[in-house]
Design a protein with these regions (language model features):
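Cytosolic juxtamembrane regulatory segments of multi-pass membrane proteins
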Residues: 280-287
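Alpha-helical transmembrane segments and their helix-start/interface "positive-inside/aromatic belt" motifs
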Residues: 2-17, 89-105, 210-211, 217, ...
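Binding/recognition "hotspot" determinant
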Residues: 1-65
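Transmembrane helix-bundle signature of multi-pass membrane transporters/permeases
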Residues: 213-221, 252-255
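Hydrophobic transmembrane alpha-helix segments characteristic of membrane transport
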Residues: 65-101, 193-207
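Non-cytosolic segments of integral membrane proteins
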Residues: 9, 13, 20, 24, ...
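Alpha-helical transmembrane segments
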Residues: 198-215, 236-239, 266-267, 271
Length: 287
C-alpha cells in the first residue's frame, strides 16, 4: 500500500497549528484584559510604594535635584546684574518650585488618581457597550463567544478558507498579547519617570520633556478607550458563516485592535507598541 506523503504532511501541519492555537486561545484572554484595561492598581503595589516613598526613592531624588536647580537659580540671580541676562522673578520662580516640589512628593498619588479617572471612564463606556450589544465588553467575552477560537481537534484545516480566517484570528491574538504587554511595561516605566518629568517644568528650556512625557503617557492610556469602541463594534457584528463579507469584517476588526496604538500615535503622538514596527526598528539597528 502506497503512502500519500502529501496528505500526511498536510495532516501534520493541521495538527501542529491546531494544538498551538488552541493552547494559546484558551489561556490568552485573562492576560489581555489585565494588560489592556489598566487602572490605579498598577501604581499601588509594593514595588511602586518602595520606588516612590523609600528613604532613597524617586521622589527624594527628584526633590534633591530640584534643590540643585534652586541653588543654580540663586547663583544666576546674583550674577544677573553683571551678565545682563534675563532671570525669572524670585516670587514667580519660588512659587513654581514650591508647586513642583509638592507634586513630586505626591507623584504616586497623582498617577493613581489619574488612572482611577480613566478607569471610571472605562467602566462607563463598558456599561454603555453592554447596553448596546448585550455582552460584557472584554477579551474574555470575545474569546468565549467567537466561532474562530481553534479547538484541538482533527476538523481544523489550515489550508481551507475557514482555517485561514481562524489562523488570522489566532495570530492576531498573539500580536495583541505582545503589543499590549509592551504597552503595559512602557506605562510602568513612564510612571517611574513622572517625578523627573515634573522636575523638567522648573525651567522653560526643559519643559518640553514634561510635554513629551504627558503626550506619550496619555496616548498609551487612551488606547484602552479606543479599544472599547472597537470591541463594541466587534460585538455588534452579525457573523454569518455563509456570508464571507461579515467574516472578513470580523477578522478586519481584530486587525484594527492590533493596530490601535499606531492609530492613536498618529492622532495624539507618543510611541508605538506595534510588534512588527518594533521588530523592524530592531533589525534596522544592525544594517
Amino acid at each position: 500500500m502506497q503512502t500519500d506523503y502529501t496528505q500526511t504532511i498536510i495532516d501534520t501541519i493541521n495538527k501542529i497549528f491546531s494544538m498551538l492555537f488552541s493552547s494559546l486561545d484558551l489561556s490568552i484572554y485573562s492576560l489581555l484584559d489585565k494588560t489592556v484595561f489598566i487602572n490605579s492598581s498598577i501604581v499601588n503595589d509594593r514595588f511602586f510604594s518602595l520606588a516612590f516613598n523609600s528613604s532613597f526613592g524617586l521622589s527624594i531624588i527628584a526633590n534633591a535635584l530640584l534643590a540643585g536647580f534652586l541653588i543654580y537659580y540663586c547663583f544666576k540671580l546674583y550674577m544677573a546684574p553683571f551678565s545682563g541676562s534675563y532671570v525669572e522673578k524670585p516670587y514667580q520662580f519660588l512659587t513654581k518650585v514650591l508647586i513642583i516640589a509638592i507634586c513630586i512628593s505626591f507623584s504616586q498619588f497623582l498617577c493613581s488618581e489619574f488612572l482611577s479617572i480613566i478607569d471610571i471612564l472605562t467602566d462607563i463606556l463598558k456599561s454603555f457597550g453592554m447596553q448596546l450589544t448585550g455582552k460584557e465588553i472584554s477579551f474574555n467575552t470575545l474569546l468565549s463567544s467567537s466561532t474562530y477560537v481553534i479547538e484541538n481537534s482533527n476538523n481544523f484545516n489550515f489550508f481551507s478558507f475557514d482555517g485561514i480566517l481562524k489562523s488570522f484570528f489566532s495570530f492576531g491574538l498573539i500580536n495583541l498579547l505582545f503589543s499590549y504587554s509592551i504597552r503595559y511595561i512602557l506605562i510602568k516605566i513612564l510612571i517611574l519617570l513622572f517625578p523627573f518629568a515634573l522636575l523638567s517644568l522648573v525651567t522653560t528650556s526643559t519643559s518640553w520633556i514634561f510635554k513629551s512625557w504627558f503626550r506619550t503617557f496619555f496616548s498609551l492610556i487612551f488606547v484602552q478607550i479606543f479599544i472599547i469602541f472597537v470591541l463594541i463594534l466587534l460585538f455588534s457584528l452579525n457573523i454569518n458563516t455563509s456570508d464571507i463579507f461579515s467574516q472578513i469584517s470580523y477578522i478586519s476588526t481584530i486587525f484594527i485592535l492590533t493596530k490601535s496604538n499606531s492609530y492613536i500615535k498618529e492622532l495624539l503622538g507618543g510611541i508605538s507598541t506595534d510588534l512588527n514596527y518594533n521588530i523592524l526598528n530592531f533589525k534596522n539597528l544592525f544594517k
